[in-house]
Amino acid sequence: MRIGLTSLAFDGKSMPSGIDYVEDVPTKRTSSADDMLGFLHGVDAGQFGTSKFENVCRRALEKWSERGYNSFIYGSPTTRQVPVQSKLGMIQSICRLLPQTSHHKHFLIELLDCQALSDYKTVRQVADAVSMIPNNWSVGVVLDLGEAVRSGMTTSDIINMPRIERFHLRGVDAEEPFDVKRMASQVSLLDRWLDYYDPAVVDLTFESRAADSHYREFIDFADRRWNA
């Protein structure tokens, strides 16, 4: 299992030791990272579903690709109320028009406000369809464990999601000391998935806006629990 952080989880100046990648955000660039990622959304993107939104997203992907980002995650709080079918239609449109790349690029669709299996199956179908486009881009699925817990996902639900490329684990109570017990429900879902599927093919990203000590303690915890 590869372990990563969002750039909001640490000072953002250099790649912390003990992690494999950083998920960058447009407002906070991280240096010295081997695997850089960007979130496909922005304050100037305009209303979701419009041609302006589509064009802004496509230009952002092209720009980040030129800067050396290998992967991109789609998932924005500003679009959570948009029906998943509309989101995926836009994603397909954007990905189909992306230019051919000389190196493999990866686009990840994050499940937000997920309705358990129904959203997963739809997103998986779109990801697989887009991955068939011969332009050296592949598409995968991200499950936000914090959102999964909030929406009532069960361990029975998650074992019916066999192909997930990345999980997001939410930090809890940024002002308090790091406490794995507060994330127990998220960890339980991930452990259940790992009972059935190969940990070698999945990434785990820690999301937190807390002090540096949180990500350091998370790295130690993740290594002991999943990479021992």
Briefly describe each language-model feature range.
Residues 91-116, 219-220:
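Catalytic cores of phosphodiester-bond-cleaving enzymes
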Residues 104-134:
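Basic- and aromatic-lined ligand-binding clefts that recognize polyanionic substrates
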Residues 1-18, 23, 30, 51-70, ...:
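Histidine-acidic metal/acid-base catalytic patches
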Residues 66-83, 103-114:
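Active-site groove signature of glycoside hydrolases
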Residues 1-4, 34-46:
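N-terminal small/glycine-rich loop or linker at the start of catalytic domains
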Residues 38-45, 74-79, 109-112, 169-171:
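Short loop/turn segments at strand-loop or loop-helix junctions that form parts
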